[in-house]
Amino acid sequence: MSALRWTRSAAGLGRVLRSPGPHRPPSEEGTFGGFCSSRRSSAASPREQHVLREWGHAELLEVLEARVRQLRAEGTPEMRVKKVQVDRPPQGHSSRWAQKLEAEKRVKQRRQKEVDQQKQALTQEFWTLHKEPKIWNKKLAGYLQPSKKGTPTNSEEKQLAQALQAALGRLSSREAEALARKKAKAVEAQILVLQQKFLAFFECCVCTGQVPLAHHVLVTHHNNGDRQQVLTLHMYNTVMLGWARKGSFRELVYVFLMLKDAGLSPDLCSYAAALQCMGRRDQDVRTIQRCLKQMMEEGFQPQLLFTDLVLEEEDRAALLRAVVKAEPAFRPPPQAPSPVNTSTLLKDIYSKEGPVSYPKLHLPLDTLQDLFYQQLHVELSSSVCVQSVEKAPVMSKEVIEARKTLQALREQWEVELLRVLRETKATMGRQAYEGQPTLYPFLCLLSEGEFVSILMQVLKVLPAQGEPLIQLAHNLGLRVLNRHLVKQKQVTNHVQKLGQRYSQYLQLLASDTQVAPCLPREYWESLGPLEAPAQQPWSVPVLLQLGKQLAELLVQAVQMPRSLAARQGAQRSIPVLYHVYSFRSYRQVGILKPHPAFTHLLETAAEPTLTFETTEVPMLCPPLPWTSLHSGAYLLSSTKLMRATEGTTQHQRLLEQCPPAQLHGPLDALTQLGNCAWRVNGHLLDLVLQIFRDKGCMPLGVPPPRSEAPRPARYQLPPGSTPVHKSELRKELARCLKVAREMHSLRSEALYRLSLAQHLRHRVFWLPHNMDFRGRTYPCPPHFNHLGSDLARALLEFAEGRPLGPRGLDWLKIHLINLTGLKKGDSLRMRLAFADEVMEEILDSADNPLTGRKWWMEADEPWQTLACCMEVAHAVRSPDPAAYISHLPVHQDGSCNGLQHYAALGRDSVGAASVNLTPSDLPQDVYREVATQVEEFRQQDAKEGLRVAQVLEGFISRKVVKQTVMTVVYGVTRYGGRLQIEKRLRELSDFPQEFVWEASHYLVRQVFKSLQEMFTSTRAIQHWLTESANLISHAGWPVEWVTPLGIPIIQPYHRESKVQVKGGLQSITLTSSVDESQKPNTLKQKNGFPPNFIHSLDSSHMMLTALHCYRKGLIFVSVHDCFWTHAADIPTMNEVCREQFVRLHSQPILEDLAKFLKKRFCSVSSIKSLKSSERALVTKLQETLQSLPKTGTFDLGQVIRSTYFFS
């Protein structure tokens, strides 16, 4: 990765624009002089070396300028910045900078003096205005200021004055109440942040065995009246659990008494901790009986200890010993049978009647067992090292010296980091024992070597342009948390139990075992309880505080010799990382940026490895089946069932409140998607690597290397250049820099994907899945999966192949023509005939992809087209094509799937026909139909003399309107649609560009008008959904609903809230738009509801299709509304797909939605706390929900016979 870094920066170009200065004499060689001398004796020309020096100085000056702005910034007193040592610029320019700073200082002092004088003069007037607002009427003003104007003389004036004063009093009262509410919310937010920090502190103390420290901090805050409000029942229970595990009964009782003293009532967890402690220390029977009696008086029966709590095995055993000692006849209740999902839509899936053909994996039991242990080793290691596919550099003397220098530096840094970490822990430990909840226990969660390893990894991947401190801190905090959670599972013997359970689970999946057919989740649950107690995730402020502390250690400890950066000057160390400020949009952002010399060192060394976190890489064995919110996917690494922005808690809360059986459908669908085994298409990968290592090819989606980035014509201007020329050069340099950074980003993404593909070549792997808040599914590994680009999809094949059968080859050919995009309006029979016509081109593409006629390169999806050409070539050349084993996934796409759902909801006959819900001989193309109708509107307007309509003659095409038609169903506005059309028009070289703005305005109106006529029910449903969401959010609630498969959904769009993490390098301000304590963001709530609701329907349709395909023995995966399976199984998948769409829309979806919204937002319990204005909104909401959109006469059963519904 380091070889891709781009070290030029537009912010420090001043040095580049100056005339070249004299050459400096070389410095004496120091400890690392070998590398410096090799740089001096490189093959680069003097001109190139001079340019590099100029760029280096520009980078250093950028750092200096940022530090000056940072330290001298006005209006940002919260930004406290520690002194960071920087390498000074050349001496020849120091006086100029000193003069500039001195001048700025004088100007600032003068301005500050003027401001102070103005403030002093206006103070009295300010308070007068604040207390008594001026009314610009002399007569009325007199009544408001009686001390200046006297008192009113007649009764009419007195009444008027009293009325005005009363009105102002009410206004002031309302303002005061609003201010009080705002302050109360701010205090609540601060207390919540503190509570999250304290709870994480206590849990870390218990995990690291430092219960006395937790006890000490708890007592310190309990005895302080102001601080006691921060303590919660969960915190007291956590400390009690720590003492229980140590068997320290006296200390536990002390905490129990503190809990009572704080006015809290003990819960089931409190009594469980006490009884565990008694079970561990063999407490006398009377004490245990008294505890049980008190517990039952509080309403908790002993059976609940074993049914309502998820306990570690050792804790459960100690608890049982204590209860049995007091009540010898007690027996824990047996495990309750798994509840059964009773959803109408899922009745066939969970029915025990009828034949089932659940597919098994193609691998035997021994192989799967071996793969499990390989994956377990990977997850215990927490990271994966992968060989980079970047072209290896020539091992010149310069490269060898750079690698030696880098290795020597890293050895020094590890020692220094270890020292600084120990010093920090000692300091924080002393503060913690003074009663402060510091980060000390967090720094004890992992070994010191693990912390150093995490920090050293940061230095390898930090980009040359730097990384925002908030982002770096968050990533560091998450890494520590994830490694801690894995380590906890090792400590509690969870790993050994998992190995035993997984061996039994593989009996269901292996190809050489015989087990009664069963869903993976059902089989896993039948093996007995394994689930460990859910780990409480740390809050974002806690993650940031820990990550920021680690980042500060890195800045403080990691230094390098100055000789690596400059040829002259004192032989001393300089920082490798600099903390600077930059502007991102309108916000000032703190950034950790590597020194340019360090970046150059990394680039020169060009190390051949990349390192990924475990969860960033596909799994080497089948994922764990999803059985709950906390159990599924990776073996040890924690994975969220519902992915969301960090800090979002409302989704988790709703899911936890769900009856377990309600989520069985989504859980089983995610498990089925994750159980699909994959392999890499090795032949295609070789071709891609050949192009990647050459110079890339953007038309084929292979990004070129940095060396292909555009360069400015010149780097410097001759002396005496005008300001205009300087400005032009600056713009040119900035443009080149922008393009180069974009290329770097794309190149890095391709590098990760191809390196992982090469790493997994000749291996079978799996992609565990989870879902977003709408129910849409996604693979967990981010860099290499089937949801990526054309190139990413082409590199993947099913690991299990299946014979083509009698019609499989035909479907391969049809799939090939679909990928080219050449015959979209033709029937399947015509596409098949066309494939036979171009068979020579297909075979030439397969045999000579880079040297032949390259027909495949003209396709819409070139790499997938090439992969299909190769598969077709192998099949037609095999002795028996029907017996050919095919691994290629064949796709079936929905026809504008969002509009299909809208048309089905509204039973819209015209709309249904446009999106292939009705049978037809040829596929209907809604985009072409809209373009045709818009052209008719244009012709009519042109006849009437409208200039823009006349200019657009010959330019209205399917491509111009497609994106707007596609996204209008997902809530695109006229403004957004205009921008989309404008972009398409600018791509037309022969379109008069002066008419682009006017033409895009005209076309977006016509597109919306066309859709209004074609999809009448669609617009009515969209309006109904939008209006409902508008009323709900104005009344103060976020919009909620439940999908047909039972997933509870809540839109996490709220007004922004801010939390500050102070101290250290800088204060970090965390801005969140998902804080449910804030009011809903009305605009996002109402605009988001229609598209999110439709997304929840398309995810329900996909999950139903996946489960029924699994029941029939098919391998099925999806990319949202694009369904994949083997060529031979396409007819079966299409049949299932249509059936489940009809079954889904046969449900009263809108009626059920209206009932849910009424119950949730219009019930007496919901509105009793609302204001009168908000109750009026609820009344209007009830009226809106009662008036459902009218539906048409479309017969939904026609979908069953529609060949092109998905095609």
Curated annotation (Swiss-Prot):
Give me the reactions it catalyses. Answer: RNA(n) + a ribonucleoside 5'-triphosphate = RNA(n+1) + diphosphate
Cite the GO molecular-function annotations of the record: 3'-5'-RNA exonuclease activity; DNA-directed RNA polymerase activity; sequence-specific DNA binding
* One of the Pfam families matching this protein, by short name: RNA_pol
Name the major location. Answer: mitochondrion
Q: Where is this region: Disordered?
A: 1-48, 82-103, 702-724
Return the annotated region ranges for Mediates interaction with TEFM: 773-1207
Gene Ontology BP annotations = transcription initiation at mitochondrial promoter
Its GO CC terms? Answer: DNA-directed RNA polymerase complex; mitochondrial nucleoid; mitochondrion; protein-containing complex
EC number in record: 2.7.7.6
The catalytic site is made up of 893, 962, 1121
Cross-referenced InterPro entries: DNA-dir_Rpol_C_phage-type, DNA-dir_Rpol_phage-type, DNA/RNA_pol_sf, Pentatricopeptide_rpt, RNA_POL_N_sf, RPOL_N, TPR-like_helical_dom_sf
**Transit peptide from where to where?**
1-41
Residue stretches of each PPR repeat: 232-266, 267-302
The record, for PANTHER family, names:
DNA-DIRECTED RNA POLYMERASE, MITOCHONDRIAL (PTHR10102:SF0)
Q: Which family does it belong to?
A: Belongs to the phage and mitochondrial RNA polymerase family.
Quaternary structure note: Homodimer. Component of the mitochondrial transcription initiation complex, composed at least of TFB2M, TFAM and POLRMT. In this complex TFAM recruits POLRMT to the promoter whereas TFB2M induces structural changes in POLRMT to enable promoter opening and trapping of the DNA non-template strand. Upon metabolic stress, forms a complex composed of FOXO3, SIRT3 and mitochondrial RNA polymerase POLRMT; the complex is recruited to mtDNA in a SIRT3-dependent manner. Also forms a complex composed of FOXO3, SIRT3, TFAM and POLRMT.
Classification via NCBIfam families: PPR
State what protein this is by name: DNA-directed RNA polymerase, mitochondrial
Q: What is the lineage of its organism?
A: Eukaryota, Metazoa, Chordata, Craniata, Vertebrata
